[in-house]
């Protein structure tokens, strides 16, 4: 088998990386034409590595060396003499990513696209070409199911379980007064839904909102802007447990503390 490794540079990753290389000693490390991609790190590294790294039909394996591991199926303790046989017996599936399109660019999002504005700049939201609302506030989040345990959760969005492929929109600190009232609650939309944000050119460039795709700032000019969103199937295949119990266990170990 041919493989490629992406590893974070944290101290705790290095021994796991060495262990993985030893386990894969009968496989061939290559730069192109690989069948497996191994990503070593936490969820943040996984997202930054693979959100726009979408190789055709390669199998992506996450190995957690960080604190949170919603995108990873293994940790260093799993890298034993049985690892390869377990790995080749697992089912890998394509997942839904959020495709983001602007006038000149198209890219994929695993967690969320975040819009921030410090001037409560108006953003018109359209759902399947129907005007939903004119939002004013601190910003907006939009993302697929996979992002519901990331920034969306911190913003009081819904935690969405596996096998529920939807798009979620969350308002951040909406501006409210008698003539400006928005939905305020998170919106959950079916996977086929097309969403569009329309923003007019600002009088001053510094008033124009800032846009971040999985934490990376986008270079969007101060001009009339339309950004569209829709779920698309990844080209890569991923292994992550879709069992309810496994997801509940991760949620409880990460977020829920009770005596």
UniProtKB/Swiss-Prot annotation:
Arranged from A to Z, the UniProt key words for this protein are: ATP-binding, Cytoplasm, Kinase, NAD, NADP, Nucleotide-binding, Transferase
Q: Which family does it belong to?
A: Belongs to the NAD kinase family.
Q: Recite the lineage of the species.
A: Bacteria, Bacillati, Mycoplasmatota, Mycoplasmoidales, Mycoplasmoidaceae
PANTHER family named in the record: NAD KINASE
Q: Which InterPro entries match?
A: ATP-NAD_kinase_N, ATP-NAD_kinase_PpnK-typ_C, NAD/diacylglycerol_kinase_sf, NADK
Reported EC number(s) for this entry are 2.7.1.23
Q: Which coarse location class applies to the principal site listed for this UniProt protein?
A: cytoplasm
**SUPFAM superfamilies for the chain:** NAD kinase/diacylglycerol kinase-like
The protein's name: NAD kinase
Q: Which reaction does it catalyse?
A: NAD(+) + ATP = ADP + NADP(+) + H(+)
Name the domain of life this protein comes from: Bacteria
Q: In the record, what terms sit under GO molecular function?
A: ATP binding; metal ion binding; NAD binding; NAD+ kinase activity
- In its UniProt entry, the species of origin is given as Mycoplasma genitalium (strain ATCC 33530 / DSM 19775 / NCTC 10195 / G37)
Annotated NAD(+) binding lies at: 43-44, 111-112, 136
Function comment? Involved in the regulation of the intracellular balance of NAD and NADP, and is a key enzyme in the biosynthesis of NADP. Catalyzes specifically the phosphorylation on 2'-hydroxyl of the adenosine moiety of NAD to yield NADP.
Q: Name one Pfam family in it.
A: NAD_kinase_C
Top EC category:
transferase
Q: Kindly identify the residues recorded as the active site.
A: 43
An annotated GO BP: NADP biosynthetic process
